[in-house]
């Protein structure tokens, strides 16, 4: 399995909109679900700092993830722009492989 982790600081008052976009029924998950290699996303909210979030996007393999990005650049960029309007910062924490 291949997991991509992202960290976000959400703009004050935009938490509900962020959760709607990045949550299990949000635009990101709907886009990713077009791929049979997509295994799901976990949206985590920091217990001590409610404007801090982490997402964990799970894929079968790195190659599957990269192929999906290549094939869906335009749709990915459109959703990413919508997310930019909700956040103060975004950082890729890393990519992780596991069995």
PLM segments and residue spans:
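An amphipathic, aromatic/His-enriched active-site/gating alpha helix that lines ligand/cofactor pockets
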Residues: 23-40, 58-93
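Short, well-ordered beta-strand segments in beta-rich or mixed alpha/beta enzyme
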Residues: 2-9, 40-69
């Amino acid at each position: 399995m291949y997991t991509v982790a992202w960290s976000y600081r959400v703009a004050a008052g935009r938490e509900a909109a962020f959760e709607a976009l990045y949550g299990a029924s949000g635009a990101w998950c709907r886009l990713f679900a077009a791929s049979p290699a997509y295994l799901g996303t976990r949206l985590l909210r920091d217990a001590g700092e409610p404007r801090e979030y982490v997402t964990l996007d799970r894929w079968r393999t790195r190659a599957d993830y990269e192929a999906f990005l290549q094939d869906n650049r335009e749709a990915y960029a459109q959703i990413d722009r919508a997310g930019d309007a909700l956040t103060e910062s975004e950082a890729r924490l890393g990519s992780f492989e596991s069995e």
